[in-house]
A protein has these predicted regions:
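Solvent-exposed loop/turn segments connecting transmembrane beta-strands
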Residues: 85-86, 110-114, 140-142
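Surface-exposed cleft-lining segments at the edges of enzyme active sites
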Residues: 13-20, 49-52, 103-108, 134-141
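Active-site metal-binding loops of divalent metal-dependent hydrolases
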Residues: 10-11, 45-46, 134-136, 163, ...
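Active site of divalent-metal-dependent phosphoester/diester hydrolases
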Residues: 22, 57-63, 67, 72-93, ...
Length: 202
C-alpha cells in the first residue's frame, strides 16, 4: 500500500476562547485543513448545529462544520456524540478516498462526558482501510474503560487481516493509549510530533 497521509485535529467546535471574548475560528480551521493536504483528516468536537452560536456569530457557516471544512473533492462523514440544549457535536472524518461504510458507537463512561467513536471504511488503492476516530475521556479510569471497549470493538467489527488506523484526541500525555492498545496489534506512530497540551486553551 502507498503512504497514507493522516491528520487529526480537535477543533473545539470552531470557536476559540470563552464567554463574550470568544471568537469564531472555523474559517481559519478550513484554511489549515486545506494546507494539511492530508488523505484523511480525523476531527473531534465538530458541531453539526448550534443555534445559539449561529445567532451570536455573523459569519457562522450555514453548513454543518464537517461539510464546511471538507476540501473540494473530499468526502465528509459525521456522527454525533453529544446533544446539548442548543445543538449537537461529535467526531468527523474527511477523506480524499471513497467511503464504503461508516458507523458509530457510544463510548460515554459517565453522565458528565458524552463520548463516541466514528468508524469509517475507506477504499484506498482498491484496498479497504478502516479508520476509527475517537475522543477519549478526561479521567484516567474512564480512558481505561474506553480503551477496553475500543479493543473489543476492533475485534468485533474489523477483519483481522484488514489495515486499521485509530486516531483522535486521546487526552493522554503518558503513553497510556499505546500500552493499552499494544495487545490489539496496533502500533504507535513514532514520527516527529510536538505537544499541543497542556496549554491554557489548547
Amino acid at each position: 500500500m502507498n503512504t497514507l497521509r493522516v491528520a487529526t485535529y480537535n477543533i473545539h467546535k470552531g470557536v476559540q476562547g470563552l464567554g463574550p471574548r470568544r471568537r469564531l475560528e472555523i474559517h481559519n480551521l478550513g484554511l489549515a485543513i486545506e494546507q494539511f493536504d492530508a488523505d484523511v483528516v480525523c476531527l473531534q468536537e465538530v458541531r453539526k448545529v448550534h443555534r445559539r452560536e449561529a445567532h451570536y456569530f455573523t459569519h457562522w457557516p450555514a453548513l454543518p462544520q464537517a461539510d464546511f471544512l471538507a476540501p473540494e473533492g473530499y468526502h465528509a462523514v459525521y456522527r454525533t456524540n453529544a446533544y446539548t440544549r442548543h445543538g449537537e457535536h461529535g467526531n468527523a472524518l474527511l477523506s480524499r478516498w471513497p467511503v464504503l461504510d461508516h458507523q458509530h458507537e457510544d463510548m460515554s463512561d459517565h453522565r458528565f462526558e458524552q463520548r463516541g467513536l466514528l468508524h469509517s471504511e475507506l477504499l484506498v488503492h482498491d484496498i479497504p482501510v478502516h479508520v476509527i476516530v475517537v475522543h477519549l475521556g478526561l479521567i484516567r479510569p474512564s480512558r481505561l474503560r474506553q480503551l477496553a471497549q475500543l479493543r473489543r470493538y476492533i475485534a468485533r467489527e474489523v477483519p483481522s487481516d484488514a489495515p486499521v488506523l485509530v486516531a483522535g484526541d486521546f487526552n493522554d500525555g503518558r503513553a497510556l493509549v499505546a500500552r493499552e492498545l499494544a495487545g490489539s496489534g496496533l502500533q504507535s506512530f513514532d514520527g516527529a510530533s510536538s505537544p499541543t497540551f497542556p496549554a491554557r486553551l489548547p
